[in-house]
């Protein structure tokens, strides 16, 4: 552009997301064109509200500043004697430096109220500007009046046909008695007095010039968001001419009754309305499950196809969903972004934090419909419900045994693999289950944290305490379905049922003899190994069965077991 400006030199670095906070005085940058009529920058300024400004992208905001600068330059160029003149505006006393013509800078006594405009800040007592940033700062009120009124010159970019003879100028402008050489020149000159706004909108009665850049604000009435649709051939919503603008006013728009959101096409209403009416139009071809949104169906179908498109670059593990990969990567990075506000414990996954916080709140939102027992975690309820249904979905591929829980299957499989990942630091004994190690360590520590409230006896294990308490209560919850006999322990019922089935699962590898009970099998094996772990303190003799040791003191005392 030919002229530098109060904004033009400093806006193209990076258009800001926040609209500039500037308000023009009523007579700001007013140019006296023919000693009579004033053309002000306000006549040609394009105003945006905050909401409209946010819809513009960086390219559109740059274009906005270009249009503003061009309009301002056009006003200045109307009365210059030379097109090569240089004008420079700066903040302070020397506001305008000009060569070739005389200019006067004056303070405006009146501020305009441009409601809804992006130029909002009061100009009074504002004179500072940050020339380094993209935002427009505050400028002094000023009015530029031309003392020299040279002959009329058109805009630099406008090329008009010239007539060589003065007699060939039939077009006369009555107000100034100026004669022009052609109708185009005459029309363009008339726009000086009308602000260059020959096109009027029949919806809002706003006027526009032929410059298509002025159409930036035409989306105000329709709610069309700039740079979102490409129906009009050129870039986004910068419409070519006034006819396109009129078309928008006449175009039918479709509104979602529930959400009060407006759409340009009826096809765009349907997906949003499905959210309100609960319709599920997208059905999975594998399992028949339906979804309201197609993206949800696509995500779901990865379960059936076993498609895993997201790979961890650290360990190569694949995942179906990006969120799963993100959570997994925190294992490698050690990141735990979710912190408990009660105990400051941290977690990798937000769902873990939510479940943990229920320990502090006591919330148990998942209740069993069969027995009413409540749980703080959904998966605990799922495991519990299998007690009522008898469902055991996890099967051991080695022996065919089935389990209700995946963790039980994992522990069982270690019997076949011999894996014992949990090792005691005191005696280096290894265990296949972590809870077994915890119980074992209490042998070394002597800890017995579980106390019977009836007799005060302590136990290392909760299961031992529960079994003991049944002695006081007489409870025998495990009943044989064949003969009706009841037992305090589930293991006792299991061994009893083998009497009816004839099952003897414990077989001696040395002689092939089979046993119903593991204790009987252990005693028998000591015959082959000659193991005698029970020693008499009186005589030093050892025995393979503890019962023989119990009878030994009677030999020394002469006590008779039977009368």
From Swiss-Prot:
Sites of the Glycyl lysine isopeptide (Lys-Gly) (interchain with G-Cter in SUMO2) crosslink: 87, 268
Full protein name: Zinc finger protein 529
PANTHER family from the UniProt entry: ZFP14 ZINC FINGER PROTEIN-RELATED, ZINC FINGER AND BTB DOMAIN-CONTAINING
Domain named KRAB: residues: 39-119
Annotated family: Belongs to the krueppel C2H2-type zinc-finger protein family.
Keywords: DNA-binding, Isopeptide bond, Metal-binding, Nucleus, Repeat, Transcription, Transcription regulation, Ubl conjugation, Zinc, Zinc-finger
Entry GO CC: nucleus
Zinc finger (C2H2-type) in chain: 199-221, 254-276, 282-304, 310-332, 338-360, 366-388, 394-416, 422-444, 450-472, 478-500, 506-528, 534-556
One of the GO BP terms on file: regulation of transcription by RNA polymerase II
One example GO MF annotation: DNA-binding transcription factor activity, RNA polymerase II-specific
InterPro entries the record matches: KRAB, KRAB_dom_sf, Znf_C2H2_sf, Znf_C2H2_type
CDD domains the record matches: KRAB_A-box (cd07765)
Predominant location: nucleus
Chain's gene name: ZNF529
